[in-house]
Amino acid sequence: MAFSSSIIAFLFGTLIGLLVAFNDFPGKRIVVTFMRTLMGLPPVVVGIIVYVLFSGTGPFGNLRLIYSVKFLISAPVVLITPIVAGMTETAISPIVKNALPSLKGMGANPFKRVFLIIGESKYQLIAVYLFAFARAISEVGAVQIVGGN
C-alpha cells in the first residue's frame, strides 16, 4: 500500500512541481506558499476530509469506496502529493533558473528542455521519492480513519 500510494503521489506531485517550476505566472508565489502550507497538513485532518467526502452521506458516497482495500491508498496520496510537489519545485527551480536560458539559446524545444532538466535533477527526484515513500510507510492515522479499525 505504501509503495503504490507513494508512486501515485510522486507522479501527481512531480507533475505539479514541474509545472510550477517551469512556468512564471501571476500568483506563482501564492501557489508556492500554498503548496508549502499543505506540506504540514496533519494526517488525521486528511483522513477526516477523505472520510467525509466518501462516506455514505458525503458527495462521493454513492461510489461506495470507503472501507475498501483499494481505497486505502487515497488518504496517503492526498497527504503526500503536496509534499512531493513542494519538494520537486524547490529542487527543480534553481536548475531551471540556471539552465533554461542556455537551453533556449541552443534551440532545444520545450519537450527536450524538460527532459534535460529532469535528467540533470535525477538525484534530487530520487530523494523526493524516497521521502514520499518514507512518509507513506509511516502513515497510520489517515489510513485508519479511511480504512476503519
Descriptions of predicted regions:
Residues 27-30, 67-70, 77, 81, ...:
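Alpha-helical membrane-protein architecture signal
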Residues 1-20, 129:
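Transmembrane alpha-helix signature in integral membrane proteins
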Residues 142-149:
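Glycine-rich helix-loop "coupling/hinge" segments at transmembrane-helix boundaries
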Residues 7, 87-88, 110-141:
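Transmembrane alpha-helices
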Residues 16-50:
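Cytoplasmic-entry segments and transmembrane alpha-helices of multi-pass inner-membrane transporters
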Residues 1, 52-83:
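Loop-to-helix entry region at the N-terminal start of transmembrane alpha-helices
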Residues 86-94:
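A hydrophobic alpha-helix feature that marks transmembrane segments and, especially
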